[in-house]
From Swiss-Prot:
Bilayer-crossing regions: none
Compartments reported by the entry: Plastid, Chloroplast
Pfam families, A to Z: Ribosomal_S2
Principal location: plastid
HAMAP family documented for this protein: Ribosomal_uS2_B
Protein name as it appears in the record: Small ribosomal subunit protein uS2c
Keyword entries, A-Z: Chloroplast, Plastid, Ribonucleoprotein, Ribosomal protein
GO cellular component annotations of the record: chloroplast; mitochondrial small ribosomal subunit
Family per record: Belongs to the universal ribosomal protein uS2 family.
GO biological process terms, semicolon-separated: translation
One Gene Ontology MF term: structural constituent of ribosome
PROSITE patterns xrefs: RIBOSOMAL_S2_1 (PS00962), RIBOSOMAL_S2_2 (PS00963)
Length: 236
């Protein structure tokens, strides 16, 4: 994996609040190597370590994107939903930003069936077929389509398991991480001071509660993905 420069600087991370962890009573001892200090009862993340692992993650996704690999971004916090969707669309990644259904990856055959139903319903709606149905039947199909759009809209073009999964909140997306571990899918995860850094292939120590922190980390990753995709397109 070739190392590159991703313009990751400490001042920018401090301004985004990336260094603020949880209260010292909530910490996970496994995060000790990534903590630099305690301040007013709160752990402070070592931003030099953050920069190192974020840079490694950017190198990984750049290389993968330059080879045409696929990505899935998972972030189901309500406040982060729009950010996840816009970042994923911008970098042409799949995403889940509402709810992670257990078995979404490990029961891929079932997920594929649901996606097929979703695509069929979308096509029928676009062709105006709902207008030719009884009102009650049309209403039922519209509700079903709305539900599928809400929960599967971000993966509607996903035809196979992703090559890399990016997780924005380890504790909230624990099931997604477990499914990736079972399937051997490489993962990148933000880890706050109350997390377990051993659960992902690359753990980026960072504040996973503040939007400015999440946005900064995610933007660096999707920029690297976009750069890699551009290289892939040029070399085809």
């Amino acid at each position: 994996m070739t190392r590159r420069y991703w313009n990751i600087n400490l001042k920018e991370m401090i301004e985004a609040g990336v260094h603020f962890g949880h209260g010292i009573k909530k910490w996970n001892p496994k995060m000790a190597p990534y903590i630099s200090a305690k301040r007013k009862g709160t752990h402070i993340t070592n931003l030099a370590r953050t920069a190192r692992f974020l840079s490694e993650a950017c190198d990984l996704v750049f290389d993968a994107a330059s080879q045409g690999k696929s990505f899935l971004i998972v972030g189901t916090k309500k406040r982060a939903a729009d950010l996840v969707a816009s970042a994923a669309i911008r970098s042409r990644c799949h995403y889940v930003n509402k709810k992670w259904f257990s078995g979404m990856l490990t029961n891929w055959s079932i997920t594929k069936t649901r996606l097929s139903q979703f695509r069929d319903l979308r096509a029928e709606e676009k062709m105006g077929k709902f207008h030719h149905l009884p009102k009650r039947d049309a209403a039922i199909l519209k509700r079903k389509l709305s539900t599928l759009q809400r929960y599967l809209g971000g993966i509607k073009y996903m035809t196979r398991l992703p090559d890399i999964v990016i997780v924005l909140d380890q504790q909230k997306e624990y099931i997604a991480l477990r499914e990736c571990a079972i399937l051997g899918i490489p993962t990148i995860s933000l880890v706050d001071t109350n997390c377990d850094p051993d659960l992902a292939n690359i753990s980026i120590p960072a504040n996973d509660d503040t939007m400015t922190s999440i946005r900064l980390i995610l933007n660096k990753l999707v920029f690297a993905i976009s750069e890699g995709r551009s290289l892939y397109i040029r070399n085809r």
